[in-house]
């Protein structure tokens, strides 16, 4: 990339239950990218362990880390909203604390955004893994620009671990909300409804950690109730139609309430393509 490469911020939120090893691997993947971020903003969502703090400190010599701590755990949406206000640059690239960015991720984003100045939200495909990247062979694809609006009526049109956006546009629509477990999906629907343009790079740029424990957490009564509340909010806000609302509730709640072992199998074989 040339000397006039746009500067950008990487935004990450962590909390007390995050793995120090996974966080270190995530930060290493940022460091190994072919284009370096101008800053890495890390928000502690409440107090975290000394091990997590040690990992952050160990990477300060390699990355321009600017870290902040919320007084108490406020949830991902609130942590990211706080982080957005700390980002110096309009181009913000999200990074999760347990995922691995491929070495060309930032370069691909910068190249795409430079050539497509009217795009405000951008993500890419992700490949799931459990222990080592590539060990599951499951790629979560998301559509290109022309299909995003239709796709968004039934599922998130962007892969949150792989997303980048223009801060000014996200702030214009009010940033992340407090939709428990669905902060990202709600933001995308709100942004699209308010004139933001989105697209997806049609290649894998992030290896996303997705273990059996992750599948277990994505089910049960609590998750099902959150699903109903989120879908009802989307309907009341006119992001989706009544028909979309009913279809989404029937298909999603059925999956959330399946027995854990069976849900994991169905999720792997079928549902992962749709939820």
Swiss-Prot record:
<keyword id="KW-0472">Membrane</keyword>
<comment type="function">
    <text>Catalyzes the addition of Gal, the second sugar moiety of the O7-antigen repeating unit, to GlcNAc-pyrophosphate-undecaprenol.</text>
</comment>
<keyword id="KW-0997">Cell inner membrane</keyword>
<dbReference type="Pfam" id="PF00535">
    <property type="entry name" value="Glycos_transf_2"/>
</dbReference>
<dbReference type="InterPro" id="IPR050834">
    <property type="entry name" value="Glycosyltransf_2"/>
</dbReference>
<keyword id="KW-0328">Glycosyltransferase</keyword>
<keyword id="KW-0464">Manganese</keyword>
<keyword id="KW-0808">Transferase</keyword>
<dbReference type="GO" id="GO:0016757">
    <property type="term" value="F:glycosyltransferase activity"/>
</dbReference>
<protein>
    <recommendedName>
        <fullName>UDP-Gal:alpha-D-GlcNAc-diphosphoundecaprenol beta-1,3-galactosyltransferase</fullName>
        <ecNumber>2.4.1.303</ecNumber>
    </recommendedName>
</protein>
<dbReference type="GO" id="GO:0009243">
    <property type="term" value="P:O antigen biosynthetic process"/>
</dbReference>
<dbReference type="InterPro" id="IPR001173">
    <property type="entry name" value="Glyco_trans_2-like"/>
</dbReference>
<dbReference type="GO" id="GO:0005886">
    <property type="term" value="C:plasma membrane"/>
</dbReference>
<dbReference type="InterPro" id="IPR029044">
    <property type="entry name" value="Nucleotide-diphossugar_trans"/>
</dbReference>
<keyword id="KW-0448">Lipopolysaccharide biosynthesis</keyword>
<comment type="similarity">
    <text>Belongs to the glycosyltransferase 2 family.</text>
</comment>
<comment type="pathway">
    <text>Bacterial outer membrane biogenesis; LPS O-antigen biosynthesis.</text>
</comment>
<keyword id="KW-1003">Cell membrane</keyword>
